[in-house]
Amino acid sequence: MMFKYRRILALCLLVCTLLCAVGCTPADEPTSDDEPEATPVVPALSLTEEDGSVRYIVVRPELKGTDVTKNAAVAVRNGLAQALGVESKMVSMATDWEKDPTSAEVAARYEILVGEVNRPESQAAMAGLGETDYLICVEGNKIIITGGSETAVRAAAEAFMKDYLSDLSRITTNLRVTGECEAPIEGTHWVKTVYPTEDSVVADIMPFEMGYDVDPSGVSDSTGGIQKALNDCAAMGGGTVFLSVGQYRVTKTIVVPTFVTLRGDWQDPDLGNEYGTVIVADVTKNVGAILSLSTSSGARGLTFYYPHQNAENPVDLGWAIEYRRDGSQCANVMDITLLNAYNGVGFCQAPYQINANSNGWFRNIKGTALNIGFSIYNNAGACSYELMKFSPSYWLAAGEEYNAPDKATLEKYLRENATAIVLGDLEMPLIYKLEADGYKYGLYIADGQRWKFWGAGMAELNITNCEIAMYIEAHYVKRMSGIIRSTLEGSEGSIVVADTSPAATILVTDCELSHEPEGGSITFVINNDGDSEKSYVEYTGTPRATSGKLYVVTEAPYNCPMQPLNNNGNFGSKDATPAIQKALDDAGKAGGGVVYLPAGYYRIEGYLTVPAGVELRGAGSIPMAPGNLGGTILLIYAGEDPEDPATAQAAITVTGDGAGVRYLQFLHPNNPFENPNKPEQLVMYGYTIRLDAKNTYVMDCFFNNPCYGIDVTSKGDDHYIKRLGGTVAYTLIHVDACKRGWIESLHDINPTYWMQGNARYGMDVPWMDVNEDVGAFMGFQQKYCDLIVIEGTDTEYLLDILQFAGGNMVVVDDGATVIGWNLSVDQGGQSCVAVYDGLLIGMNVQRTIGGDGGTPVCKGSGEIIVYNEFHLLK
């Protein structure tokens, strides 16, 4: 279903309206004898005593009502105070319970009754109200604001503030107005966002629309309502909690549980300053992070604003988003604006830097941070750091509503005190398009807890107007990193190395430096011939369904069998294939749509076909990195032991233009790989997904234990494959004779995922033990696993690819051309790139130990052109 979200008028705007309205004067009296008699003027209530004190007390129910009604009453109290020009504490507030009052005493009081209060006037007003009906009326010395449900009570309070506190003369002795609110929605919904998104947005929970205790006007505290929505989503197995456009006041830490994403409607701040979904961090001291992320959770599409922050003497109000946990699968942060955070996004910060993390995706994080914009330590496996941008311009452009400071004051403070991006002890990070302007340090490479920074591929950095563009506190001894096609501009230095940093080598190619690198023991190899590719050619398509219609397979008429997630091997016994295919067919006949599989297990005993304009989609809004159990898991049983796995029917075939697969995990329960020393015992399957049409895509999916992952046929022109995780026995991606395609953000493709299957899912078949068989399985992959094979394709673009173990990471054959940026293999058995027939142009290409220790980074009889090639630990 599609929903357009109504924006709640902020109370501050209502006060402005009030000031205008109070100053109005009556029109001139009519002079003609023929004019009808004027309607008698009904007197307005006097809300104050003669001494100026507030006459009315706001009363809410003690027992009948939850925080929704309580917060509605608080909003009315605060709104009345603002309308009268007094502090909120000057308006008394009470519950309807007290010991033994007389009826005469209660009747004599001047009260504003919010919700189902135990007063006769309130009870009489409630009579006959339907679930969506509300009533605002005056009965004697009582102002009644009530409704047939808590959602209706909230709507009544909003209407009272908007229509009556903005013009107190309208609160008359005969006031009586009824209204109707929208009924709370239920179930999963496709969201019609105000601002464009990369994907179709599917929400499992929409807190405001579903009646949770959240307030998009920013008046009431939304902390509890958001937390409850997140917890409810986690209990469903994970998914997306979507906050529609508005301002949500938060006063303490909100924890985002495992496999849950808190998502908003995000306007890119480079395109405007409406911002969409704004988290108003109403804190005056460091209460911890506003959002605390759990393993495999996410934050996406949110803007953070701190109303009590200032630019002259910034206050440490903690992190906007933080991850503290110890575990191999960290969280993901995408599409975030920081208007004026002290600290923006922090992963494993002190004192939690002893906790290792890996497999995070960090993309489109922008804003103004007064101390640190983004910081991460102790990353044990590669993460992708893409499209970050920090500058004073973001807060300055926010305007008066967001307390934009004096330009000179803010710029001076940032230039003297703040750091845009801190990268600590990271292994082989994949870094693309990080920008900083106007900071003391643009990029700070910090010493770490477990390692030091090494093996980085850094491309298209743009650091300008900083004191020091890049400061290197420590780099791992004798290892290498590469920087290409970047601008590093600092008044005191482009790249400055601490004297304590160990000896290492950094390749710098086709970069603009304001100063020569200086200090420390690092050797810089600089090549500015200008021959490398000038920039990465980014994908410009729209990988999403062509229609907003949503087909939820577990609902009627499909009633697809789904087994709730568990780790005892209970996958259910009913085949989900027919019901899912029926939904796919219906979506195709309707011209497109999203076929949604809520979190759980789905047995696939047959084959699925995805028609044109249709997206087959699981729960979530972020990439998959299952350190824990959650999300949508397809159990692949069909296609065991085919005659030719490379050409056998895939479990899922995308046959229509513009169709795709997103947010799914794949598990082959009958493929335990019990004895990795005998590959003939591997249970063979064909490809999991085949793309057999143009403009098709696979994004944000996880492969637990396939023999083969994704096959792109010659029909798959302009395919887009991005943010995959997991492992594979032979080939994860095969591309055959297309005109053009993109493969991006694959990192830490790692054999340990296969071995974790028994512990995570509770298999009933023998399974490798992660502690005993890791070396043997790595040996198998180093011999047989070529991760990406490109054959006969005119141009394939690769960005930010990392494989752990495996054979050749990228194979180029049959005259294909591959242009790759940031390609890395760790402990591979063979080369990072093997070009047998074709052309590779590579920017930042590396491999570490593995094989015989002397295997080249690139090999083959084809043409190989590489800028910044480095072999670590030969």
Model-derived regions, located:
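Sec-dependent signal peptide cleavage junction
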Residues: 19-39
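Bacterial N-terminal signal peptides that target proteins for export
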Residues: 2-12
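Extracellular "leader-to-stem" segments immediately downstream of a signal peptide or signal-anchor
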Residues: 32-39, 86, 149, 159, ...
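Right-handed parallel beta-helix
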Residues: 264, 295-306, 328-340, 355-372, ...
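Structural detector of coil-to-beta-strand junctions
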Residues: 240, 278, 287-290, 310-322, ...
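Solvent-exposed alpha-helical segments and adjacent loops
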Residues: 35-200, 657
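Bacterial N-terminal signal peptides
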Residues: 12-20
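Structural motif
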Residues: 59-67, 113-118, 146-149, 245, ...
